[in-house]
Structures are given as structure tokens and as C-alpha cells.
Amino acid sequence: MSARLEVEILTLFPRMCEGYLAESILGKAREAGIVSVSVSDVREHARGKHRVADDAPYGGGAGMVMKPEPLTEAIEAARARLPGALVALTSPRGARLDQALARRLATHGRLVLVCGRYEGVDERVLAAVDMEVSIGDFVLTGGELAALCVVDAAARLVPGVLGNEASAGAESFAGEDTLLEYPQYTRPPDFRGMKVPEVLLSGDHRRIERWRRREALRVTRERRPDLLERARLTENDLRLIDAGDDEL
């Protein structure tokens, strides 16, 4: 069976990625052949005895810039290995990663993720990429964490990766209404005086579903009201927002 999602990560520090990719859901998906993720060292395309992949910026300034030759050649080699792949550079200037973008990337099926480093990459490298991706308005040491976020978010949407296919649809930002997920509970039913809501122990699946929907609405209103404004709410949702447990 060929993998449903094929990814190659281009980085100066392969070991930063390999540990995460071998564990948990991603590790199992790779073992099962559902997702294929390889990590390639950009330095393999660098010149000289010391395989230098960065240099001082023209015009002066702090830090180093990733050189265009090794990075562009690494991208070209990855494209040859994954024909038709979408090449994305991790960059604070990029499109913000959200569930919609993760779904788009998962659907594409083949991705090459280029990890930025230092003060950034030589601007001429952008001629070899299709898009830039950001995971938020903050600064990281390098793009490896961002690339892993992209892989994780996209892989979860690939059929067969999650043990329960309903899991992805119930999570925060899943589906079209963009609500945060409802609170989750497990055993024991009473922990230091904090009890699991009675409705979840009732066995009444209709009431449980209504409770979960109400709680998703409540949590979203309290913590991300901007999402609630964009959500596709029904008349029943509007009634549920302020409903008590006895009204479920």
C-alpha cells in the first residue's frame, strides 16, 4: 500500500525531527505505511570541506543567512523524489497554519517542508518554493518545530491515521463551525472533590451530545469569541448556549 501522505523535511538538524516523528500517532502511521515522512540534511548539498550552509548577510547586520545554493539544490532533489509535491518554507511571513490549511496540505498528498534557520533564508530561495507557512506571531530558533506542527496537523486528517475516525471531527477547529472542543473527563468520577458532570454518567446519548455541544459553545464564547462570530450557529445552538443541565 502506498502512503496516503508523503512528506520530506529539509533541515540542517535532522535529529531534531526524527525523535518526534518516531513516536505516538505519527510513529504508528509511518509503521503502517499510511504516512511517509523522511528527513534530509541540507548540508549534503553544501560546498567545500566543511559543508557550510550559511553566510553573513549582504549590507551587514546580526546573524547568518542560509545560502541559496545548498537549499535550492536540496529542494530540487526533493522534488525529484516526490514529483508534484507542494514545497512550503517555514517562515514568519507565511500563511498562518490553521485547520483549513492543514486539510489542504493533507489533501495535496505530497509535501516538501523547508526549515528556515538563523536570520532566515536567502530571498532567492523563494523562487524554488510554492508557499510560506507560519505557525504564529512569535520567534523560534528554527523552522523544525513549525515543520513538525505542519506534519502532525496534516497527518491527523489522513484516513486511517487516528484509531477512531470520529476523533478528528470532534476536535477544536474541526469541521465548518470552528468551535473549540468540549471538556473531556475520564476515571475516576470524583477527583479531590471535583466530580464528572452527571450527564456524562447518565448513559443518555442524546443528552450527552447536547451537553457537549453546549459546552463547546460556552468554552468558545469565553476563550475565543472571534471563532463564535464566524461559526455557523443554528437556532438550537443559540438556545443551548445559556441552557442549564436540566434543560438538556
Curated annotation (Swiss-Prot):
Positions annotated to bind S-adenosyl-L-methionine: 116, 135-140
Subcellular location: Cytoplasm
Reaction equation(s) it catalyzes: guanosine(37) in tRNA + S-adenosyl-L-methionine = N(1)-methylguanosine(37) in tRNA + S-adenosyl-L-homocysteine + H(+)
Gene Ontology molecular function terms on file: tRNA (guanine(37)-N1)-methyltransferase activity
Keywords: Cytoplasm, Methyltransferase, S-adenosyl-L-methionine, Transferase, tRNA processing
Record keyword tRNA processing present: yes
GO cellular component: cytosol
EC number(s) reported in the record: 2.1.1.228
GO biological process: tRNA N1-guanine methylation
Main location: cytoplasm
InterPro entries per record: Alpha/beta_knot_MTases, tRNA_m1G_MeTrfase_C_sf, tRNA_m1G_MeTrfase_TrmD, tRNA_m1G_MTases_N, tRNA_MeTrfase_TRMD/TRM10
Gene3D superfamilies named among the record's database cross-references: 3.40.1280.10, tRNA(m1g37)methyltransferase, domain 2
Family: Belongs to the RNA methyltransferase TrmD family.
Stored HAMAP family: TrmD
Its job: Specifically methylates guanosine-37 in various tRNAs.
PANTHER family hit by this protein: TRNA (GUANINE-N(1)-)-METHYLTRANSFERASE
Subunit structure: Homodimer.
Protein name listed in UniProt: tRNA (guanine-N(1)-)-methyltransferase
Species this protein is from: Anaeromyxobacter sp. (strain Fw109-5)
Taxonomic path: Bacteria, Pseudomonadati, Myxococcota, Myxococcia, Myxococcales
Designated gene of the protein: trmD
